[in-house]
Structure formats: C-alpha cells, structure tokens
C-alpha cells in the first residue's frame, strides 16, 4: 500500500486487542459474486454529488460528519483521472500478435467426445502484442531472453504493459512468476528496478546488475496495472480491484498461447502492498476456469493490505514500540490512537457488511486519518520505521526518482515498445479513485479460504514496515476462518534460517505453517523486503517456489 496523499492518509494507529471479524462462511459464493462484478468494474466514479442527494439519512449524516473532519479529502471525491498521452505504435513494430477471438475459437474434443473450447473465459475483446527486447541495447541482463508488450482491450480502450524476463538458470523447467506492485496506482516496474528484477538503477541513471534477482531461478513477468499506471494507458479510468482479475487471466492465457514453452511450468503470483487486494481476486479468477493453460501453483503476498478490519488494529502497537523497534510516538499520542480504534473498526465492519462506497469511503477516510496521521506527521518513513522519509516527492526513496527518470527516457521507451509519452512510478489519481469507490476496505480476504482449498498461500512481511506491518499481517492470517484455522493460529513461530549459501544457519526471520497456509516474518525488511534484505528475500522465494512448505 503506497501512501500517495498526505491529505487522505493522516491519522492514528490502533490497539493490540484483536478486532472482531465477520467472515463469510460461504466463501465460494463470495468468490463467485466478486468475479461476476468484473463486467461492471470498468466504470469510473461519476456524478458523485448527484448520488449524494439520494443517500439515506444515516448514510448522509456519516458523510457529512467525515466531511467536517476532513474537508480537503472529501473535496477530492468527484475528480477523475485524466487519460495518458500516448501514440500507438504500428503493427510492424511488434514481433508477435495474438487474437483473443481466435484463441477463444479453438475447439477440442472433450472427455466424452464432445466439442468444447480449449480454454475458458471471454477473450474475444482482448489481443496481445509482444516484441523481443534486446538486452544489450539497455544493458539489462545481457544474454537473458526478454519480451515486452501490451494486452489490449480495444472495446474498453485498455492497454496494459508487461515486461518478461526469462530465468537465468533453467528456463525450460523453472517456474514462471507474475509480479505486482501495489498503491493502488504504482507501477510494477518499480519492483523490477528497486527490488527483485535483474537490475537496479543507480544515481547516474544507469542499470546495475542484481545478483539477488528473482529471475535467478524463475522467469518473471512484471505487469503495469491497473490502466494508466506506469507504461499502461487508457482513455477511461478504473476504480476497483475486480476488473484486474479478468485482465490478468486474459493476459496470461494469451501469453502462454503465444509462448507455450512456458505454459507447462509451475506458475505463481507474487506481489506486495495493495496486491494484498489484487492477488486474491486474480487467483480466484484463474481458478474459476477449469479449462485453462495457466498452471497456478501458489500465491505470495508481501506486506499486503488484505483485511483492514484486523490490520488497522496494529498501527498503534507498531508505532508505540511493540513491533520489535523503538517507539516513534509518545504515550499520549498512543493513547489517543487507542481511543480512535473502536470507531474505526465499527466503520470498517459496516463496510464489510454492506460493501457500499457510501459506507466504505467514510471508513477509509476516517481510519486513514485517525490511524496513520500521528505517525506520518513525525516525518518518519511509513515504509521503514527505522528512519526518516528522505524524499517526499518519491515516496521517501531517492531510488524511485532514478527509476522514473530512467524509464522516462525515449531510448528506453523505444526499446520496450512503450506507447506513453512519459513515465511516472505512481498515479495519484488511481489511488484516489480506488479509495472513493470504496475499494480500500473491501473484504477481499474472504476469498483466501477458497484459495487455500486449492493452492498454497504465503503471507510474508518485513518487520520494519509500518504501513502494512508484520503484526497486522500475522494477526489477520491467524484470524482467518478456514478449516485449518485453529492449528495455524496455535502454531508457534519458528526460526527461519538460510540453508542455501555460505551464510547457512543465519537467522533471517520466523515462520509458521499449517496445511496450505504459511506466514513469514523477515528480519530487517521494510515494506519492500527484496530491496532491504535481498539475500533473505531470494532465500525464502527460491525455497517457496521449490515447494519446501507445501
């Protein structure tokens, strides 16, 4: 979860007592409902003031109360994101074209001899473009095969950019991983160049080889989503998570159709921050299609926002010295945060019950102002409790500015086929639109029990992060209702040690696991674990995709 607006995210943190949680027992029904929403998800927020007039008295009173507390936040509600300037490249620029309509029209003989589609899903609106990227032209992982391109939905004018890096090791057998950054509204190319990709960008705006890249033993796809993030673009807007699920299913289906040499390998989805929203939806969408060419084996969520009702109860403990690091706030501020917690949790609970923007938006604004503000006003880095925010214009990290400058260069955009006129690491408008559509506190954690029935789920958390801290991630994973809840919650944290290199035996964190569910605490990692602890990050990643814990 990137904090993109000090106005929206100023507040208090919360108490150590575990909050109550309503979990929908019929998680399969919930998953089906979420997936069905995808058809209506590509609709920007419109006519907010007109709709406000039709609210019930109680809902209107809540909005007016929050508006009085935080007028600048509420004034942002009617605004929409502007389309990105772009120039579509001619078909001759691309090496490969895949038509979703043609893929959907492939029929095969079923088990009983009847004709059936080779793959499920509505793909007719989608097309995939791809080109070979010359590694030597960019100086990024020379000798490693790379593809980049766009998933196009021309009906809705959506164009999602991706960049694929083949495994450095054994690409014919190594797994494939989709990586997603959060925000909402932040480019996954920041994850590529700041965290786990084959290169970082130095202060001279030059690529530097990354020995700890996750493509050491896996092929990795970095996807800029939702639309109007990074190199992706659209003439419209998007304001919630469910649309992404169908887009990602289409992207993967068409990509593996064009490049079948990767389709039989194990496939995993990994991401951080607001990807704690994205990943349960995307994985549920994939698993809902019985006939698919996507060999989904697991998901990994790092320092994610997944269950706000539980997680917001752990801002006060983390800020006040109970997360393993010295307190950032004084005793009186910690007490005021305790005092705000019950109101915040009751508002989130109401959002969980209704999932209405008119309930969820006030909850988001109140809780973000009440739960995050005291910490944020100290100037401390919300992504790393150990230091100050060094560059407010780049979300506290100078390196993000280097990445933006590099990816904005015309030569780089030409090399990867980017069609936008520039590059921004994060789109503040998308962040605001998601919040004002009520997506922030939607209970997407209710999809996780359905995932656990079919695939392993890893929740990992760097223990120096504040914004999506390890205390809250541990708490929600233990509170989740699923058949193995009791055994998982009661399991003790055990030492996580390096086993694969010269530092064998070094403690890098703690782990607990039962059935298909695993939680990891990574020592010394902030919001971006692979950046802060590259050795530890690659260690647990390699062992996870190798199947050690499932």
UniProtKB/Swiss-Prot annotation:
This is Carboxypeptidase Y homolog A. It comes from Penicillium rubens (strain ATCC 28089 / DSM 1075 / NRRL 1951 / Wisconsin 54-1255). The active site is at residues 273, 465, 527. Residues 18-131 form a propeptide. Belongs to the peptidase S10 family. PROSITE patterns: CARBOXYPEPT_SER_SER (PS00131). One of its GO terms (molecular function) is serine-type carboxypeptidase activity. InterPro entries: AB_hydrolase_fold, Peptidase_S10, Propeptide_carboxypepY, Ser_caboxypep_ser_AS. Glycans are attached at residues 217, 516. Vacuolar carboxypeptidase involved in degradation of small peptides. Digests preferentially peptides containing an aliphatic or hydrophobic residue in P1' position, as well as methionine, leucine or phenylalanine in P1 position of ester substrate. Disulfide bonds join 186-426, 320-334, 344-367, 351-360, 389-396. Its EC number is 3.4.16.5. GO terms for cellular component: fungal-type vacuole. It catalyses: Release of a C-terminal amino acid with broad specificity. It comes from the Eukaryota. The gene is cpyA. Residues 1-17 form the signal peptide. Keywords: Carboxypeptidase, Disulfide bond, Glycoprotein, Hydrolase, Protease, Signal, Vacuole, Zymogen. It is found in: Vacuole. GO terms for biological process: antibiotic biosynthetic process; monocarboxylic acid biosynthetic process; proteolysis.
């Amino acid at each position: 979860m990137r904090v993109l607006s000090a106005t929206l995210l100023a507040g208090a943190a919360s108490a150590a007592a575990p909050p109550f949680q309503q979990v929908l027992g019929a998680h399969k029904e919930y998953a089906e409902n979420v997936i069905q929403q995808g058809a209506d998800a590509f609709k920007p927020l419109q006519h907010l003031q007109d709709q406000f007039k039709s609210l019930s008295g109680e809902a209107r009173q809540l909005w007016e109360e929050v508006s009085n507390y935080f007028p600048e936040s509420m004034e942002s509600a009617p605004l929409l994101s502007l389309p990105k300037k772009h120039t579509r490249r001619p078909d001759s620029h691309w090496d490969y074209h895949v038509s979703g309509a043609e893929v959907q029209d492939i029929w095969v003989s079923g088990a009983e001899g009847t004709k059936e589609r080779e793959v499920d899903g509505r793909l007719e609106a989608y097309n995939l473009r791809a080109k070979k990227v010359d590694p030597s032209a960019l100086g990024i992982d020379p000798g490693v095969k790379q593809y980049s391109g766009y998933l196009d939905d021309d009906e809705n004018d959506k164009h999602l950019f991706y960049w694929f890096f083949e495994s450095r090791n054994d690409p014919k057998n190594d797994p494939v991983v989709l990586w997603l950054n959060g925000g909402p509204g932040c480019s996954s190319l920041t994850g590529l160049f700041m965290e786990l990709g084959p290169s970082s960008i130095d202060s001279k705006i030059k690529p530097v080889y990354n020995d700890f890249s996750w493509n050491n033993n896996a092929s990795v796809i970095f996807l800029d989503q939702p639309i109007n993030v990074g190199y992706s673009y659209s003439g419209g807007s998007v304001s919630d998570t469910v649309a992404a699920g169908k887009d990602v299913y289409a992207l993967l289906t068409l990509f593996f159709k064009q490049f079948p040499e990767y389709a039989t390998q194990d496939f995993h989805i990994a991401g951080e921050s607001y990807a704690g929203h994205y990943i349960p939806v995307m994985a549920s969408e994939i698993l809902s299609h019985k006939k698919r060419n996507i060999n989904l084996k697991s998901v990994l969520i790092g320092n994610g926002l997944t269950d706000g009702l539980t997680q917001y109860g752990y801002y006060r403990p983390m800020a006040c010295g109970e997360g393993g690091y010295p307190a950032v706030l004084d005793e009186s501020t910690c007490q005021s945060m305790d005092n705000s917690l019950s109101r915040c949790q009751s508002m989130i609970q109401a959002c969980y019950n209704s999932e209405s923007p008119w309930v969820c938006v006030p909850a988001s604004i109140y809780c973000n102002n009440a739960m995050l503000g005291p910490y944020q006003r100290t100037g401390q880095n919300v992504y790393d409790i150990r230091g100050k925010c060094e560059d407010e214009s780049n979300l506290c990290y100078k390196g993000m500015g280097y990445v933006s400058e590099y990816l904005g260069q015309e030569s780089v955009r030409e090399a990867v086929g980017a069609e936008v006129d520039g590059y921004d690491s994060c789109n503040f408008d998308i962040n605001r639109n998601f919040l004002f559509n009520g997506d922030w506190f939607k209970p997407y954690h209710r999809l996780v029990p359905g995932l656990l029935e079919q695939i392993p789920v890893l929740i990992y958390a760097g223990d120096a992060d504040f914004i999506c801290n390890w205390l809250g991630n541990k708490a929600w994973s233990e509170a989740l209702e699923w058949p193995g809840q009791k055994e998982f919650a009661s399991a003790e944290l055990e030492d996580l040690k390096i086993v694969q290199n010269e530092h064998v035996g070094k403690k890098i964190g703690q782990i607990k696991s039962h059935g298909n569910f695993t939680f990891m605490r990574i020592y010394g990692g902030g919001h971006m674990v692979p950046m802060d602890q590259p050795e530890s990050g690659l260690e647990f990643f390699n062992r996870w995709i190798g199947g050690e814990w499932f």
